[in-house]
């Protein structure tokens, strides 16, 4: 959003089953209202999954992009990397990636080799990209592009802020805990939510009971997912007997302000 004054964006907008699949969504007006950029150009092409070769070829023909930018695990884009030679004749491939831990994933080498620009969201990622490519770095560009949040939207608040206090009272039904852990993501296996819940249980066990009873773990995610696990069962197994109020599920869609609270 906040690069709309530098770039025109066309996004293949994926979802498991996108309700707007097949449409072309023009976001220019909403981006202008959000950023004040009066000539913003942001377009979405909703698809199921992560797209495919046919839609990319059509976008290249219709939109004539100057570059292609990828985000997330490269294995979701094997279809695109299989088109590498076709694409890179005229359009560079750029990849905003993260790999946080060693050993360096040598099995990613073919993906990295298919990119003209590798942007790491941590300095360690940049180093790992270079280690994997080794002597095959060629003339690729490596950049450190750190993750960030819009500080106008996500910021510290005065504990006495009226709306903040009202939200907490409503959210916790007037029984506001002293310590809160907040999880906000999808219920999928790689997020390892049950492991985090077990760690929270260990944390509670390390506290006096009266202190532990004033702590809460808020899970803003699906309770049950085919792509993850049954978190209600995990809660029942780890918490219900000793800490029945320690886990709170949140399913309602939250506004940006509410997420900041």
Please state what every model-predicted region is:
Residues 173-191, 197-200, 217-218:
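Conserved donor-binding/catalytic core segment of Leloir-type glycosyltransferases
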Residues 1-21, 29, 63:
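N-terminal subdomain of nucleotide-sugar transferases
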Residues 22-117, 123:
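Extended catalytic core of nucleotide-activated donor transferases of GT-like folds
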Residues 188-192, 204, 225-226:
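A short, basic/aromatic alpha-helical/loop segment that forms part
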Residues 43, 85-86, 214, 219-223, ...:
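Nucleotide-activated donor-binding/catalytic signature segment of Leloir-type glycosyltransferases, i.e.
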Residues 96, 121, 183-185, 220-222, ...:
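Short hydrophobic "strand-cap" motifs at the C-terminus of beta-strands
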Residues 155-174:
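A short helix/loop element that forms part of the nucleotide-sugar donor recognition site in Leloir-type
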Residues 15, 124, 148:
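Carbohydrate-associated surface elements
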